Regions:
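Mid-to-C-terminal alpha-helical segments outside catalytic/metal-binding sites
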Residues: 229-255
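Short, hinge-like loop/turn segments at secondary-structure boundaries
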Residues: 52-54, 125-126, 203-205, 232-235
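Hydrophobic alpha-helical segments and helix pairs
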Residues: 77-122
Length: 255
């Protein structure tokens, strides 16, 4: 890997380490690009609190921290400023003007919840419900076609235990949409490292059949994740086994 665009900070409440430690480890690994893409704040109705993302009043500090590191390490490594954003169509109109007033270089789409998160199950929970899978695919396709995102992180996160034929049908639809709108799909190193449901081999078989482009994403929640050569090797083996079109870098899409 020469680039990683999927890096978190402690502001999301489930990552550790200083941003500087991630950058130093990236230099150790010979990376040319280390993009930070922590979980974006969202403006939810009522008193709902989303525990796995930064608060809105932390966004300015996040931006300042990344831009400061970019200036300090200029000439040694590129440090683009990004966010990982869930595609919640009903909530985006309030959030997007805020993000567009900031020097955000890119967004990556992650979809751990369908709907608007508040009253929906986590997409990674096991389900045999065909409708949940269909809704996940519908919402992520809408997100890909929105033009907001540079790539789709862990698209195979959904944990569907129903009929393989249904999974193939729906996820092929997702992959076809990704191909049609030139949306790279992320092979997620954190999922591989922790033995999660993703990377899902059946999904990547479909992605290969549809000719999708892919990118490796460390999804780093600790500085040591940047140094994890073993997991990188395993993900590269998956890419080679399915003859996937691996992108070393991706063009960033501004919002």
């Amino acid at each position: 890997m020469i680039a990683n665009y999927h890096t978190h900070t402690t502001r999301c409440n489930h990552a550790v380490g200083l941003e500087r430690e991630y950058v130093e480890n990236a230099l150790t690994m010979g990376l040319k690009i280390l993009g930070f893409s922590d979980h974006t704040p969202y403006i939810f109705p009522g008193d709902y609190y989303s525990h796995f993302r930064m608060k809105l009043d932390q966004l300015g500090d996040y931006v300042e921290s990344v831009l400061s590191l970019r200036k300090e390490y200029a000439g040694r490594i590129e440090i683009p400023l990004g966010l990982e954003l869930e595609f919640y169509p009903k909530l985006l109109p309030q959030l997007l003007p805020i993000l567009r007033d900031l020097p955000i270089d890119y967004l990556i789409m992650g979809q751990p919840f369908i709907g608007n998160e508040i009253d929906e199950p986590y997409s990674g929970w096991p389900t045999e419900d065909n409708r949940i899978l269909e809704r996940y695919v519908d919402q992520t396709i809408e997100g890909m076609y929105s033009g907001l995102f540079t790539y789709f992180a862990h698209p195979d996160l959904i944990h569907f235990l129903g009929d393989d034929k249904v999974y193939r049908q729906q996820m092929r639809r997702l992959c076809q949409a990704a191909k049609n709108c030139n949306m790279p799909l992320e092979v997620n190193l954190l999922g591989m490292m922790e033995g999660r449901i993703y990377p899902n081999r059946l999904f990547w078989e479909l992605a290969a059949e549809e000719g999708c482009s892919v990118v490796l994403g460390r999804d780093a929640h600790a500085p040591k994740h940047i140094l994890d050569i073993k997991t990188e090797t395993r993900c590269l083996e998956l890419v080679r086994n399915f003859d996937l079109n691996l992108l070393e870098t991706v063009p960033l899409k501004s919002i």
